[in-house]
UniProtKB/Swiss-Prot annotation:
Gene: cpt2
Name the record gives this protein: Carnitine O-palmitoyltransferase 2, mitochondrial
Classification via SUPFAM superfamilies: CoA-dependent acyltransferases
Organism: Danio rerio (Zebrafish)
UniProt EC number: 2.3.1.21
GO MF term list: carnitine O-octanoyltransferase activity; carnitine O-palmitoyltransferase activity
Amino acid sequence: MMAGLLSTQCNSTLSKLKHLSNNPALSVLTSTHRKYSSKDGAGSEYLHKSIVPSMHYQKSLPRLPVPKLEDTIRRYLAAQRPLLNDEQYSNTEKLAQEFQSGAGKQLHEELVALDKKNKHTSYISAPWFDMYLSARESIVLNFNPFMSFNPDPKPEYNDQLVRATNMVCSAVRFMKTLRAGLLEPEVFHLNPAKSDTDSFKKLIRWVPPSISWFGAYMVNAYPLDMSQYFRLFNSTRIPKYKRDELLTDDRGRHLLVMKRGNLYVFDALDRDGNLIKPAEVQAHLKYILEDPTQASAFPLGVLTSENRDTWTGLRQKLLDAGNGEALQLVDTALFCLCLDEEVLRDHIHISHNMLHGDGCNRWYDKSFSVILAKDGQAAINFEHSWGDGVAVLRFQNEVFKDTTEKPLVGPGSQPASVDSSSAVRRLEFKLNDELKAGITKAKENFQAAVSKLTIDAMEFKKGGKEQLKKKKLSPDAIAQLAFQMGFLRQYGQTVATYESCSTAAFKHGRTETIRPASIHTKQCAKAFVQQPGQHSVEQLLGLLNECSKYHGQLTREAAMGQGFDRHLFAMRYLANSKGMALPSLYQDPAYAAINHNILSTSTLTSPAVSLGGFAPVVPDGFGVGYGVHDEWIGCNVSSYPARDVHEFLRCVHKSLEDIFTVLDGNPIH
């Protein structure tokens, strides 16, 4: 009866999801909009005990739609329009129309048929894994991003040993909570007063998992895909020729710790799978911090920063030299904790250290690493193939909340009187001359790559989310518009721009692309940058409004799986896998250009995260991490020598000043 009622009320996936579109923060779907209200007091083993089982909604999540081909072509051409002159656009339009009625029609039909056969997943999941795992470039800078933790509000708890101990304990508690099915499901609440309540949870837990999603939907709550979570722990990317593999072995009870490029392991769980005493974790970490062993002349971790095929060959040589057991301990460890000896001076120093560091005190292949500097500055650096940061951000939020609200050790805590010298093992590796030469070469390659990277940050203090919302403008749209204006001011052109948007509202959803550069942003940027004084305040406000409305539409479409990028990507992947001649749309220089993302952007706001960052995705690009806060807007931007990041940020700041001047009703000159 209930199933029938629910399914008749929720017959169309896309209409079910339309309410999601009202939220401006959809590009990250972060946990900041949800409070976890399940019962605490879960003892030292669990963070909390959710009333609703963690994976209760997973089975009934809606499937990621394959967009209609005509919609994809229309959206593709709309995104190409501001990037091309009339002649180029006319050619691209012709190729797109040929594709729609010819090769594209066939590929689309095959993709839809394939998708119907694989109802347990999404059409993008396998090709997306394949894309990441087949990439041969170094994962450092090219793929791994970082998100840094805010400091503990209690300064004395930022001591490196105290914070490391608390983070390890909270991380293990998170893992245990997740594996016991007691972690609160990831749900996006549009009406928390109705859906984020114990009474609703007690009701929904009895709705069968096959239809539970619909029950949540009826109270405007949207469960999100949690299929990536199982790769958080005991997981590593293993280098292989042509295509890497992901290894997850949840039998591992040990933690991997790195200091001065040396690798240590100790069991963080006892034989019964319980967290060892926090005082014992503290004792073992203290022992590692005080270990006088000097920095390794041949730090093995730097090999994980190499070209993937090069690393594959060297890994085989490591195995041949008798290092199999030590490598297995690295690969199956719960996660990696990197204890750095540097004190970090400022945001820029933090970004460089957490994004890449010196290459020696990292194992970049681990699913994630918690990095802790000498002064207690902390961050997560994560390998990107297994997930999109949705699981990592949830983990980071929970760990920050747990370590700051319920720390298990403090500045006055005494480490346990245990024999850490027998509990902690420093891994020894047998290295022949060939391996030593490989490590030396990897160090050189690493230094050459990171020495080209510049990072700069900017804080705009004259306004933020609150003021923009009062003016009925999308905060994300205005931030993206400022990047378009900034680039136009600096370089005089409009270029391919990428904004990541989560499709976690669907089963095995990954991301879709929002294309922030539009005919609207181009017109508005020209008015502000190249024609100041030629437009009235009312006209400029009208242009801002148009940009905001259109960006909101693009965001809604992307979050509902209605972009064009993933659909075109999947059809291209299908053509390649069949050995088909590549359709002419994909050979169009304009297709290459729109996928050469000079502005690669991603937004993040969370109470746990102070800043996030990543390198540009192309040599002549910018990597733009940003957050629109209540009263201010922050950007953390990277570039290579082809671009001037300092000047770019000055231009973005000037753009924001102009926008807020107009919002105050004043003209710009």
